[in-house]
Amino acid sequence: DDDGKFLPKISDFQGMYFKDADPIIIKTLKDSGRMVASGTVTHSYPFCWRSQSPLMYRAVDTWFIKVTDIKQDLLKNNEDPRWVPSFVQEKRFKNWLTDARDWCFSRNRYWGNPIPIWASDDMEEIVCVGSIKELQELTGSKDITDLHRENIDHLTIPSKKGKGVLRRIPEVFDCWFESGSMPYAQSHYPFSINDEQFMKGFPANFIAEGLDQTRGWFYTLMVISTAVKGCAPFKNLIVNGIVLAEDGTKMSKSKKNYPDPLYITKSYGADACRLYLCNSPVVRAESLQFKETGVKSVVREIFLPWFNAYRFLIQNISRYEAQNGKNFVYDPSMVASLNESSNLMDRWIISATQNLI
């Protein structure tokens, strides 16, 4: 059942938590002479990411969006935006769209936005409500202002097929459906603005997220936009890689397998961390194993030489001003004269700056 306990039809173990039943099941098999083999096997197993308690996969009734019907439209719309780097669009995301399956958008939990579907007990009559106004008209309730489930689950819709009343299904939306609906929800479209106003800011000029969002936000944005508007939801997209712990595993607050960002900032400065990330595989949508020593080396190999060069410049400006009795002022004409200089060091400096350009 929903609590992980065996149902009454499993008479020998009814009401027992599935993990607590393991040793009893083994003993029952042994006592009945039906045990073929018993031992310990090491294998992957699902655990709750919060409580770390063992999980059991169980088939439940869910609601799906038939993504397979619009797969070709998804592939076509994927060709329009500009992706940086481009290989994510051409390989990873395209492959994900090519193998797209129907999307299970419902979740069996309490917290979440309620799916606005009312159905008869036999599921043969279904109504999907499109607005508060429509819900008021269908239910006859005029004081609907809050759409959280505790405020609408009691509302019923009279059946048009003689099936009594329709009740809201118990499921709520997958949070990724909500993320993919962001372009419309942020402006309360189509209720607060019309099509013309909406299209002034759609598709988005630019979005950015991590590589893992090819299966998350990028995907749900594209599916909903293709279904609702027939086009891609963005014009330009920048993808960054994933920053991992030093040992190559996912960063985890519970495992504390990464240095505190505030410690890094306080010890080495925010700019050192920024430059470390800017000069890493992350900007090429590749993974980075974050190392504190990497940030430290940026300070030692880049920022300290920069600071020493700056200090050398300031010291010589101060000496120049003291010797000449006037302020040092940048003179663009001096650059032109340096280009014609016969001094080898001057010519090297000009050459180095041209290489930078």
Regions found by a protein language model. Name each.
Residues 1-129, 133, 147, 217, ...:
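Residue patterns forming the tRNA-binding/recognition surfaces of aminoacyl-tRNA synthetases
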Residues 113, 237, 314-336:
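Short, glycine/acidic-rich hinge or "gate" loops at secondary-structure transitions
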Residues 19, 322, 328, 340-343:
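Intrinsic disorder/low-complexity signature
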Residues 1-4, 109-111, 119-121, 129-287:
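Alpha-helical recognition segments enriched in aromatics with Gly/Pro capping
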Residues 72-75, 193-195, 245-247, 329-333:
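Short hydrophobic/aromatic-rich motifs at helix boundaries and adjacent loops
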